[in-house]
Amino acid sequence: MSNKLKFYLLSGPVLVSFIFALTSPIIQIYFVSRVSTEIFAAANMLSTGLAALVNSSVAVDRIMRWYKKHFYSIVIIDLLCFCIVSFLSTEYITVRFLGLAILNAVSTNLWCVLMRNAVNNIIKGDSLTKWESFESAWNLGGQFFGAALAIYFIDMPLELCIGLQCIANIIMGTTDYKAWDMLWKGKDAKL
């Protein structure tokens, strides 16, 4: 795996881990304190049910081929919907919980499954385990430093936190887009 590919595969997720750890305390406290128990429970149920359906569909070769063919569309739809849902949710709390439940279960889930599948296509066995551990360590490092800074940035405006999460997701979408090309079409591809 080339260093450029490693950079694309690591930089977006590490940035997302860092930004979400930095901003999530403010966002979660704000929204959880304003949502009803019924909406919260419905969002959990919706997310679980949809994720089960989506993950079941990945096992069907014909459907998985369709997902791979439409990877870019899945990422773009996920990014657009995440930003729309995130900003609408400041006025409509229910939109956040139900919208993100659907996104996390469907498009975000597919995005992650497809990226893992692409990496699994070029790395196998012990090398795959080492890569996944390396990737996890970097993501946890980003999360750790984001959480450490969150202790000091407790007064960030909600809109700034939401904006930072949207920007981090867009950057991750861009790096995954480039990594996808390298994994399936570039010199790192192993078909």
Regions found by a protein language model. Give the residues of each.
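Glycine/proline-centered helix-kink
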Residues: S24-P25, L140-I151
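Intracellular juxtamembrane helix-capping segments at the cytosolic ends
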Residues: I27, N109-I123
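Loop-to-transmembrane helix entry/capping segments in MFS-fold secondary transporters
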Residues: T37-E38, I123-E135
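C-terminal ends and interior cores of transmembrane alpha-helices
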Residues: I76-Y92
